[in-house]
Amino acid sequence: MKTFSAKAHEVKREWYVVDAADKVLGRLAAEIARRLRGKHKPEFTPHVDTGDFIVVVNVEKLRVTGTKAQDKKYYRHSGYPGGIYERTFTELQNQFPERVLEKAVKGMLPKGPLGYAMIKKLKVYSGSEHPHAAQQPKVLEI
């Protein structure tokens, strides 16, 4: 019996919607990254994007444990000397609630062209509304 290898044009992708209200950031991000990669499917192939589409709503209600709300820092750099910026989890959550989950999931996916294709299948929205009703996403309990 030969080892099965998925082909990119044969992959069946599902749409799922996840409610992030009162979920822990890291645990949610790990499961989302697993499903974006396609590791939950029996036809998973490392060099093919076999993952599903994930729509996440209510990301402004995400939480972190312990004192990470004040201690966790997000850094970015302008490219100029001394141009480093830092924000805490709370500051980033208040200003750009979607970015917190996007950054967490992106760090858990492979780097390179395949990882970039996987992160494009993640749709993150604050609030309970999303524009993907036409895809009829299934509710995914995490």
From Swiss-Prot:
Part of the 50S ribosomal subunit. GO terms for molecular function: mRNA binding; structural constituent of ribosome. This protein is one of the early assembly proteins of the 50S ribosomal subunit, although it is not seen to bind rRNA by itself. It is important during the early stages of 50S assembly. Keywords: Ribonucleoprotein, Ribosomal protein. The gene is rplM. SUPFAM superfamilies: Ribosomal protein L13. The keyword Glycoprotein does not apply. This is Large ribosomal subunit protein uL13.
